Amino acid sequence: MKGILGTKIGMTQIWKNDRAIPVTVVLAGPCPIVQRKTAQTDGYEAVQIGYAPKAERKVNKPMQGHFAKAGVAPTRILREFRGFAPDGDSVNVDIFAEGEKIDATGTSKGKGTQGVMKRWNFAGGPASHGSKKWHRRPGSIGQRKTPGRVYKGKRMAGHMGMERVTVQNLEVVEIRAGENLILVKGAIPGANGGLVVLRSAAKASAAKGGK
């Protein structure tokens, strides 16, 4: 499954066939190939790529040796893609084609501590008719002596956001290889400047326009 690392620049819109298309601009690559894993030596086929330069003085000795063995400068981020065997010494945006379906993974924006209405879309309590200080409460969270506890996974107030989120089957609208830019239709998780992982769509089908 081919993939590349990049940075979310932001959203804009472009005109295509007299239609405005909302797109997310991603600055992707070039990502140097740090390691190629084979079935003979590692038990599976994969490629490890790096992204975002890192000062050598901030890299520990084992990782310095890892990068030196590959003959590439140290990078801040390393990711592995199985079943991907690109040519050359780096991965660029031209691994994808316009119209291709991809999956985008990012870290969602942190929202801090939120209640059940914002976090889980609960309806809350009545707005009036005797309701007092119950407008945004979740309601009952359990039973009685049996089971005598709150079940694991119960949807309650708490920290929201800052989670790994993947949006599937996004369309590649345009590729600007000279600028290392990919324009993807729709929204991608995370704030501007955040790390984005772009992969071939895992669930795309020919009926949906996947490749």
Curated annotation (Swiss-Prot):
It comes from Deinococcus radiodurans (strain ATCC 13939 / DSM 20539 / JCM 16871 / CCUG 27074 / LMG 4051 / NBRC 15346 / NCIMB 9279 / VKM B-1422 / R1). Keywords: Ribonucleoprotein, Ribosomal protein, RNA-binding, rRNA-binding. The keyword Ribonucleoprotein applies. InterPro entries: Ribosomal_uL3, Ribosomal_uL3_bac/org-type, Ribosomal_uL3_CS, Transl_B-barrel_sf. This is Large ribosomal subunit protein uL3. Transmembrane segments: none annotated. Part of the 50S ribosomal subunit. Forms a cluster with proteins L14 and L19. Also contacts proteins L13 and L17. GO terms for cellular component: cytosolic large ribosomal subunit. GO terms for biological process: translation. Gene3D superfamilies: 3.30.160.810, Translation factors. The gene is rplC. Pfam families: Ribosomal_L3. The keyword Methyltransferase does not apply. GO terms for molecular function: rRNA binding; structural constituent of ribosome.
